[in-house]
Curated annotation (Swiss-Prot):
Subcellular location: Cytoplasm
Sites where the protein binds Zn(2+): H554, H558, C656, H660
Protein name, per record: Alanine--tRNA ligase
Keyword line: Aminoacyl-tRNA synthetase, ATP-binding, Cytoplasm, Ligase, Metal-binding, Nucleotide-binding, Protein biosynthesis, RNA-binding, tRNA-binding, Zinc
Organism per entry: Idiomarina loihiensis (strain ATCC BAA-735 / DSM 15497 / L2-TR)
Family: Belongs to the class-II aminoacyl-tRNA synthetase family.
């Protein structure tokens, strides 16, 4: 029975939902619970904490179709995509999971039942593998399911034993393969011919029943779990009776759409496969909040986009094409993933911008690479060439490697890495940044934070550091770190800077100049005003006025974030922030400058919420509950099971551990001071609030009044007055240029008479007194036309700058070139130049040498002609 991809996905999810499994929507491809992973690359990743026992869900069995990506780090399929039948950057992993509910027997029965009854695959076409030592699974397959022993293979630990890491949950696997029949080459799993295409793995069942200890021993888990995975693309190929995933309905629709957009009829071309695969990964990455950039996930996205664009170029694409595939992708997958349809325009805009940006350098980079390959002595493209393409023309390394492979060449990866390393060293030397001192310190203490409600608190000194080492006492005047049993001091985190203040014993004992985390301990950095010893009782007092200003700015970031999403779109996500006492800055994903009018709208919107005096409410809740309620979480941040939700009326709701005002009215006033780009796809807005915003407004008003006074007009008319002055200035510039041209023409009339003969060639070599450099070019052309055949070299000095222009009539360019002439003179005045054979110009910085420069050029011409 043939089924399309959507039908198979629905059948799988419904099958397990009908058997008591929670149908869990696909999580983001940006893992929220694992900072070690660049992307979600398996169906179990969103459940990792459940398997580890650090999280508990309201259900004990689940099913999902998880969006996955393999294009960076350890799991990197990028170079094979399009060239093999089953490699993809993006794929859907369907799975069923048990968290201590059912185990091995039920999992095997579910898999067999779904394959043979729901999908109606012939039992005789299925082949099974088990771990060599897993007799239990072997017996279930043979005795309970009835699989013949000659269609079961026992496989070793490398392929049939799964581990989450060197230690932790692990267990044996059992895999189900589909047999395409004798007409396809290949052998059963475990045989020397297993890499053939006859037997294709379709489902992997992982039985997590052990906990691997540090010494390698396996201890049985009290609640064994099940993790299974079946690739939608692979099972679709089998159900549609094709041997390549690219032949299934979903890919064929994308391939045909790409061919039509580009204008090619060769539907079997590998470049179309690459493009069809890459539009899926790129679109879903943007859906999940990733934008093209030069680092991290953003750079992986950029690499994939540029690889697709280059393959479009191979097919003859002359215009931007890649973004136009988003419509077809939304038609194919929008029902299963509504977010794709919702963010369609954002995806298209981001892809089109990136494609346009790369198009500016693609042709030039390809030409340079072609020249280098043409001059290549061996079969390895040098690392410095690969680096130049990367650094100057935006060619990702794997893109250059792709091109090399097509011509049976390789790249010098070691040489490239060496060039990259040298560049990084240069950047580090320029930045002058050192190691974070806190990273060198260790503390086993966990400080209780009391600062949400209090600005003063009693505590005991539990740890002291001096020069990075634990001590029992700090003497007066010594710099150090104090760790307390509890504290109202907020340690820098989440973009909010640490508190300042004082620790008091019998008078001020320790001035706190900064507060940071050391592990889970809150570290008070500063200088002792009196002796401080372990176990001392102190009163911790924060600088409450400074804290109030920080609270205003932090609450303002939440209002700004919500206002940005309302105004610009839901693609806006926080990329970073810095909340200080006197100002704050907010970095966010957006692909173009925020206009002046939009900035004004943002100010109006945020100040409206300030005037509304919305109450600020905080609540601790489960992370899943918070997300379901609509609380914004930052991509890539790791959150505890219990999170703090900060709500400002119905306008803003975010996960946040920082300190905030009691109501938005406490912010007072919100003013944006600047907006700009800090990286590709990332913008920054800087803001002041409260008293600082009042001072900023007054300063602006004062400057405006001063300008109005200078212009002798009212403040409301300043813009109009400036426009009038600009118009007058441009008119004067135009008249001045006309006058300079007339003066140059008059000077030119006299210059013709000064033409000298150099070995039968007429030449005009002269200095003009403070002539406009722009007018010299036209004058040289006029002189060449009047001479008919000849050479012109003119120089002028304006202040400390020298301008030189040389011209040669076309009949003489085979004998002497304008660029050579002008450089002879430029060398003398401390400059250089260049241009065409018939016209060239140069600059210099030694006006006192101009006469000598012209004489040098004359002597050189006498030698050349």
């Amino acid at each position: 029975m043939s089924m399309n991809s959507a039908q198979i996905r629905d059948a799988f999810l419904n099958y397990f939902a009908e058997r008591g499994h929670e149908k869990v929507p696909s999580a983001s491809m940006i893992p929220g619970n694992d900072p070690t992973l660049l992307f979600t690359n398996a169906g179990m990743v969103p459940f990792k904490d459940v398997f580890l026992g650090t999280d508990k869900r309201r259900y004990d069995k689940a099913t999902s179709a998880q969006r996955c990506l393999r294009a960076g780090g350890k799991h990197n399929d990028l170079e094979n995509v399009g060239y093999t039948a089953r490699h993809h950057t993006f794929f859907e992993m369907m799975g069923n999971f048990s968290f201590g509910d059912y185990f091995k027997k039920q999992a095997i029965q579910y898999a067999w039942d779904f394959l043979t009854k729901e999908l109606k695959l012939p039992a005789e076409k299925l082949w099974v593998t088990v771990f060599t030592e897993d007799d239990e699974a072997y017996d279930i397959w043979v005795k309970d399911i009835g699989v013949p022993e000659d269609r079961i293979s026992r496989i070793g630990e490398k392929d049939n034993f799964w581990s989450m890491g060197d230690t932790g949950p692990c267990g044996p696997c059992s895999e189900v393969f589909y047999d395409h029949g004798e007409e396809v080459w290949g052998g059963p799993p475990g045989t020397p011919e297993e890499d053939g295409d006859r037997y294709i793995e379709i489902w992997n069942l992982v039985f997590m029943q052990y906990n691997r200890q540090a010494d390698g021993t396996l201890e049985p888990l009290p609640d064994p779990s099940i993790d299974t995975g079946m690739g939608l693309e692979r099972i679709s190929a089998i159900m549609q009776n094709v041997h390549s995933n690219y032949e299934i309905d979903l890919f064929q629709a994308l391939i045909k759409a790409a061919a039509e957009i580009i204008g090619t009829n060769d539907l079997d071309n590998k470049s179309l496969r690459v493009i069809a695969d890459h539009i899926r990964s790129c679109s879903f990455l943007i859906t999940d909040g990733v934008m093209p950039s030069n680092e991290g996930r953003g750079y992986v996205l950029r690499r994939i986009i540029r690889r697709a664009v280059r393959h479009g170029h191979l097919l003859g694409a002359k215009d931007t094409f890649f973004f136009r595939l988003v419509d077809e992708l939304a038609r194919q997958m929008g029902e299963a993933y509504p977010e794709l349809e919702q963010k369609k325009q954002i995806i298209k805009d981001a892809l089109e911008r990136e494609e346009q940006q790369f198009a500016r350098t693609l042709e030039r980079g390809l030409a340079i690479l072609s020249d280098e390959i043409g001059e290549l002595k061996g079969n390895v493209i040098p690392g410095d060439v690969v680096f130049k393409l990367y650094d100057t023309y935006g060619f990702p390394v794997d893109l250059t490697a792709d091109i090399a492979r097509e011509q049976e060449l390789t790249i010098d990866e070691q040489g490239f890495e060496q060039a990259m390393s040298e560049q990084r060293q240069r950047a580090q030397q320029a930045s002058q940044f050192g190691m974070d001192y806190n990273q060198q310190l260790k503390s086993d203490n966990k400080t209780a934070f009391t600062g949400y409600d209090d600005v003063v608190g009693q505590a005991k000194v539990v740890e002291l550091f001096k020069d990075g080492k634990p001590v029992e006492q700090l003497q007066a005047g010594e710099n150090g770190i104090v760790v307390l049993s509890e504290t109202p001091f907020y340690a820098e985190s989440g973009g909010q800077i640490g508190d300042k203040g004082v620790l008091v014993a019998n008078g001020p004992a320790f001035e706190v100049t900064d507060t940071q985390y050391i592990g889970k301990a809150i570290a008070h950095h500063g200088v002792a005003k009196a002796a401080v010893k372990l176990s001392d009782s102190v009163k911790a007092e924060i600088d409450s006025e400074r804290r109030e200003n920080i609270k205003r700015n932090h609450s303002a970031t939440h209002l700004l974030h919500a206002a940005l999403r309302n105004l610009l779109g839901e693609h806006v996500t926080q990329k970073g922030s810095l909340v200080e006492a006197d100002k704050m800055r907010f970095d966010f994903s957006h692909f173009e400058p925020v206009t002046t009018e939009q900035l004004a709208q943002l100010e109006r919107e945020v100040n409206a919420q300030v005037r509304a005096n919305l109450p600020l409410q905080t609540q601790l809740m489960a992370i899943d509950e918070a997300k379901e309620a609509g609380a914004m979480a930052l991509f890539g941040e790791k959150y505890d099971e219990q999170v703090r939700v900060v709500r400002m009326g119905d306008f803003s709701m975010e996960l946040c551990g920082g300190t905030h005002v009691k109501a938005t009215g406490d912010i007072g006033l919100f003013r944006i001071t600047s907006e700009g780009g800090i990286a590709s796809g990332v913008r920054r807005i800087e803001v002041v609030t409260g008293e600082a915003a009042v001072r900023y407004t007054q300063q602006q008003q004062s400057v405006l009044q001063q300008i109005a006074g200078e212009l002798k007009t009212e403040p409301s008319s300043v813009a109009e007055k400036v426009q009038q002055l600009q118009h007058k200035f441009r008119e004067l510039e135009r008249k001045n240029e006309q006058l300079q041209q007339k003066l140059a023409q008059q000077a030119g009339g006299g210059l013709i008479a000064q033409a000298v003969d150099i070995n039968g060639v007429k030449a005009i070599i002269a200095e003009l007194d403070q002539a406009d450099p722009k007018s010299l070019r036209g004058l040289v052309d006029d002189l060449k036309n009047q001479m008919g055949s000849g050479i012109v070299l003119l120089g002028t000095a304006n202040g400390d700058k020298v301008s030189l222009i040389a011209g040669v009539t076309t009949d003489l360019t085979s004998k002497v070139k304008a660029g050579d002439i002008v450089n002879q003179a430029a060398n003398v005045v401390g400059g250089k130049g260049g241009g065409r054979p018939d016209m060239a110009q140069a600059g210099g910085s030694l006006p006192e040498q101009l006469n000598e420069a012209l004489a040098t050029a004359t002597t050189w011409l006498q030698q050349q002609l």
